[in-house]
Amino acid sequence: MRSEPEALPDEVVQLLAPFFPGYDLARVRTIEGIPFYVFGNPVGYADRDRIYFEAGAYRLDTPEGLALLAHEVTHCRQYHRHGTWRFRARYLWSYFHGRLNGMSGKEAYLNIPYEIEAREVEARVYLTMKRLQEN
């Protein structure tokens, strides 16, 4: 069962804004529950300006939770930057290109340029939030 879409809390928008210059984080909505059509058992899934999280995964009180959110927000920004259908086509093309070149499903996924960018942002947010937590 999915929850109703919710806006990001203002304090989260303020924390993440420096990582997403020029992107309006107020447009993002979060929803608990992954859509039935999504395969691979992801913890999070972005579709345009909506982010779906596995139940219990949306934890804004931890560096890990904020980093996961940043990963998915990166995909929202990619949708916005490239357009829905272009983003989806390039994402899937990259995945299938990897598979056709002998990569495992996981390797192909990890080598999708959009995923590489999202993991880079995720890592930066995690390190920043961890430092803030320690101070």
Each model region followed by its residue ranges:
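Short, aliphatic-rich beta-strand segments
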Residues: 49-55
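Conserved residues at the C-terminal ends of beta-strands
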Residues: 31, 54, 79
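Short alpha-helix carrying the canonical HExxH Zn2+-binding catalytic motif
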Residues: 62-78
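Amphipathic alpha-helical interaction segments
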Residues: 58-59, 76, 80, 84
